[in-house]
Amino acid sequence: MPEITVRAKSKTYPVYINEFALEDIREKWTKSLAKFSHVFVLTDGHVAELHKAKLDAVLADLPVVTYYVAPNGEEAKTFRVYEDVMTKMIETGLDRKAVLIAFGGGVIGDLGGFVAATYMRGIPFYQVPTTVLAHDSAVGGKVAINHPLGKNMIGNFYQPEAVIYDTQFFATLPERELRSGFAEMIKHALISDLTLLRALMDTFTEPKDFYTKDLTPFLQRGIEIKANIVAQDETEQGVRAYLNFGHTFGHALEAYGNFGKWLHGEAITYGMIYALTMSETIYGLDFDLAEFKTWLEQLGYDTTFDASVPFSKILENMRHDKKTTFNEISMVLLEEIGKPVIFKADDDLIFETYKRVMRKGGNVI
């Protein structure tokens, strides 16, 4: 089975990825899980309904397994749900020899990792992602919950024991979710490899391709790109910030929409267009943005922003971005495809770029 090794400073661990990953790793994994006092599975209602039986079959021989079913979507990454999960773990009697399995998409992985990092000052956990989007979030150890003023503002760096990525789960994903996850695949290509970007653009030309074309080699390449960056900079003191390409504006948009109006990948797509536009202004980026946007539209993405989004709110949310220091907003831009840089953007540039990408010039309120 294809296996990618993540060599972070704090831990080295495998990412298992293929269409039958859970079955292929079952014997080895259950032997490891049997060493723990208790297995605590964190999932959400949607994943539990569709896939709990599959995980149950894998965990059937383990003596003590407890499930916690969180709300669907970003609602799960709140203080309220975080506290409720902790309460359930304490009431169930989980000790420091327990293990947590985050079974779901990126939200569950973020929440589950943060719970594991903070319960009794840290217990081991496994990532078992079920979405395309989670190929990015499940790898690298970033774990967090949201604050009303910003996405992922309360978090930690905490690596899993392993990532078990069974791509069979994709068959039940709605098109909108697949498209959201695909945005992170595009991001990895933009920051690393023009050839990879061209391969994506040539292979995926309409929404049905998300179901009929093989995503796995592109997911593997994206994970390898991220693993290489994490090996250099686990805690985002330097090059790991490049993985935030499109996220400064994208996270600001998500926060404005109360983490519900846009899916993460939808917001990040807007953010990448914003960053590419600013890259043209600052670095003269040689890239056919019009062709790129046409391709995105063919895949079903919206590439122009709702003009009701007020600039003042976006700017305020961008100031809450984790890369912002001394009140200076840091943008990940591209000098060329595959060559990202950090750029301190002033308010005038942020506003001028905003006007260029917003439908009808935006709302300056």
UniProtKB/Swiss-Prot annotation:
Cellular component, GO, one term: cytoplasm
Binding site for Zn(2+): E184, H247, H264
Gene Ontology biological process terms in this record: amino acid biosynthetic process; aromatic amino acid family biosynthetic process; chorismate biosynthetic process
Gene Ontology molecular function: 3-dehydroquinate synthase activity; metal ion binding; nucleotide binding
Cofactor details (free text): Binds 1 divalent metal cation per subunit. Can use either Co(2+) or Zn(2+).
Localisation: Cytoplasm
Main location: cytoplasm
Pathway the protein contributes to: Metabolic intermediate biosynthesis; chorismate biosynthesis; chorismate from D-erythrose 4-phosphate and phosphoenolpyruvate: step 2/7
Top-level EC class: lyase
InterPro entries: Dehydroquinate_synthase, DHQ_synth_AroB, DHQ_synth_fam, DHQS/DOIS_N, DHQS_C
Needed co-factor(s): NAD(+); Co(2+); Zn(2+)
Substrates-to-products reaction catalysed: 7-phospho-2-dehydro-3-deoxy-D-arabino-heptonate = 3-dehydroquinate + phosphate
Keyword Nucleotide-binding: yes
UniProt keyword 4Fe-4S present: no
UniProt-listed Enzyme Commission number(s): 4.2.3.4
Binding-site positions, NAD(+): G106, V107, I108, G109, D110, T130, T131, K142, K151, F169, F170, A171, T172
Superkingdom of source: Bacteria
Record keywords: Amino-acid biosynthesis, Aromatic amino acid biosynthesis, Cobalt, Cytoplasm, Lyase, Metal-binding, NAD, Nucleotide-binding, Zinc
Family recorded in the similarity comment: Belongs to the sugar phosphate cyclases superfamily. Dehydroquinate synthase family.
Function of the molecule: Catalyzes the conversion of 3-deoxy-D-arabino-heptulosonate 7-phosphate (DAHP) to dehydroquinate (DHQ).
Protein name per UniProt: 3-dehydroquinate synthase
Name of the gene: aroB
